[in-house]
C-alpha cells in the first residue's frame, strides 16, 4: 500500500482530510480546549510548527464538519457536533508593513468576512466593522461566535526593536482587537496564536481574561510531532529513510533526534520534533537543514546586535526563571524571551527547589542554522569560502590532523579583508567560535571556566580534547605558553582522551592583511 503524501506547505485541515494526506492526530487537544474553563485562549509556538493547521482544525470542528474527523480521537469524544459561526483571521501575511499598509490589510481581512455574511455597507473603523461582524453572525445563526486569529503578532515581529514604529502598529492592532471584550457574551470561543508574547496591556488592553496555554503541561504536545507520535505512528517512514541512508532503524532514529528533536515548551514535557523539518526530511529522503531555509530570522539577528548578545553565549546552557524567558518581547531587557519564543533555545531541565529552568539550543539543525546566519555579520565577505573551509576542516579533525586543518584556516584568513571595526580580540574570538561551532561533529565550549582561569575554546572529539587559547597582537607561542602556565589542560587529565594544546594568534600586517598562526603541543 502506497504511503500517504505529506502535507508540506499545506495548513488547511479540510483539504488534508479530503485529499487523504498524512495527518498527526491532534484533535484530542482541540476537544480538551473547547470543553475547558474559559473562552479566550492564547498559544505561542515557533514558526512552521503547525499553529495554522491547528487553527483550521478548530475551524472545521466548530463548523460541525463531523465527516472530516472520521477515525480521529475527537470522533469518539464529541457527541453533539454543534455548528457555530466562525470568523477566521489570518495575520501571517501582515509583515513588513507601514501603518497604512496594515490598515489596508485589516480592511481586506474584514471585507472577506463581510462578504460571507452579506454586509454590504460596512463602517470605516476596523473595530466597528468587527463588532458588526460578530453581531451579524450571532443574529443570523442564533449561536455564539467563534473567533480564530492566526499569527496575531506577525505585523510586529520586524519592528520589535523600533519603538516609534512598534507603538504605531500596536495601537492599530489594539483598536482592531478591542471588540473582543465588549462582545464577550456573543462569543463561544476565541483562540489566538503567534510566535512571540506581547504584553496583554499593549494589545489586548480591554481583554483581561486570556488563558495562556503555551506552558501548560496538558498542551505540551499540541503542536509539533512528539517522540511517541513519531515512533508509534511513523515507523514505516523511518524504515524507508533508513533504507535510503543505508543505516539501521536505530541509527536513523538517532540522526532524526539529533537534528530535529529537543523541543520542550514546559517541564515535564514529551520530546517534540520540528514538524516541518521532520516531514520534509521524510519527503526528500535526506537529513538536511530545512527550517532555516523556509525563512531568514532577520529580526532575531537585529535584536542580537541590539542586545550585544555574542555568538559564544548561544553555545552555553542558560538558567532563568519563567518570567525571564516567557515574557513580553517588547519590554524584554535581554534577548532570552525572543530566543525562546522563536524556537532558537528551548527548555532542557527544571529545578523545583530553585524554580529555575535550564535552556539551550534544541538540536543540530538550529545550531548550524543560527551560526550560519551569524557568520556574514562577522565575515562581511568570503562566507561561502568559509563554509567550504569548515567542511574540509571537519574531515581533517576527524582524522586527527589538527595541524592540516589549521593550515586550511590560515589560508582562508589570508583571503579575508581587514576592517577597522575588527581590530580587537573579541571579534576574532567570536568569529573563531562560530567557525568551530559549525564543526558539527564535535563538542565545542567557549570560555570554559576552570580553577586556573578561562579556556578560550575547547573542542572534544571521540578520542581527543583540544585546549585552545587565542591572542590578538601577540604570538601563537605566547598563547601556547598561557595554556601551559595556567595548567588549563589539567581539567581534562582524567578524561582518558589524548589532550592537545593549541595556541592561536591574529596579527594585522602593515599592508592590512590578516595573519593567523598557531602552535600545538601534545601532552
Q: What role is predicted for each listed range?
A:
Residues 432, 455-472, 486:
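Conserved catalytic cores of phosphodiester-cleaving nucleases, focusing on short active-site segments
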Residues 136-141, 435-462, 509:
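Active-site metal-binding core of divalent-cation-utilizing nuclease and nuclease-like domains
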Residues 146, 464-466, 500:
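Structural motif
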Residues 167-171, 472-489:
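Mg2+/Mn2+-dependent nuclease catalytic core
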